[in-house]
Amino acid sequence: MNYNNSYNNEDYLIPVLIEDTVQCLKFFPSKDINYLASGGWDSKLRLFGINYQIVGQNSNKDVVKITAEPKDTCKHQSPILSLAWQGTTGSLFTGCIDGSINYVDCQKNIFTKLGQHNGGCKEVLFVDNYNILLTGGYDGALKIWDLKSKDPVISYQFYNKIYSMGYSRNLLVVALSENVMAYFNLDNLQKNIFEPELIYSSHIKSQIKKVVVMNDGNGYLEGSVEGRIAVKYLNFYTKPTLVGDGNYGIESKNDFAFKCHREIRSRENLVQAYPINDMCVNPVYGSVVSVGGNGKYYIWDITEKSKINERENCQDKTPLTATDINKGGILLAYASGYDWSRGAQFAHLYTRPKIFIHYLQKEHRKSKNY
């Protein structure tokens, strides 16, 4: 069955019953096929086919018809924290709160456990150009897996929990508890070397929740629980500079940070900071999307240090918990639902989790100077 539902004029609701918060969204990594995978705290992996058609113009903007078709659902034994497509094969990897790492092919009804972390498996990344699976867990272990033997080929043990990982080209960045950051040069794997180029403390004072790497692999962004994003540039061939409190850190004249996902509480005349729950980089245009606890998503032009667009999900300010952009750079998926940042006692104030598709108009994909 196909569905076509609009929300806030431009956002399209996928009418599927989701029992608990959506933790992760990933589009299929092909411009020709717009499959969307979701995973979350109801322990279900869901697949949707997303289609769009430009049917006209209104005030110089595209009028778009979007349809969403549920494809498959795969029940897991534990909530899903992360997922990744295995390139364009159609199969996926999932990481769960029980530490399990799983291989899933919904079309062939194949579900195989690949391995295990001693804590929750917070991140799974399939690195296409190296054909490897990377996983990071709350046990502090960063592992590369042999998909045939079900054993890690190599691993690196941190002293801190892994909260987020991101990569592009040869750059892998890891965000850990206590604001510890690390980055790796994946080209070193050809020399059987799997050691971080640098381990250091983030300049952001609050906990880093999400990290994403720029498309060109020349830098990355950190998103924190108190509504702040830091943009960091690096070069593998530049010697790190000693900065702040005796910690080795990367420092570039182009680095900057900014506040976001904050709301003014008029009665108290105070500023309420909300967590940045997820970020993604537009694979075509390089703009960055952040979603947060204030129920808004923002689109950022990092090069021009400016905001391209912002949008609120709904009137009750239900937090946004996950996001991704399709390979063509024009469809934005995001999930709304309680992010539990205020505790269980406030869960009843928010609506049931939902997944939306937003068509990015041309002026919202990139800066005016692109």
Locate each region found by the language model.
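WD40-repeat beta-propeller superdomains and closely related acidic/aromatic-rich repeat-like regions
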Residues: M1-Y370
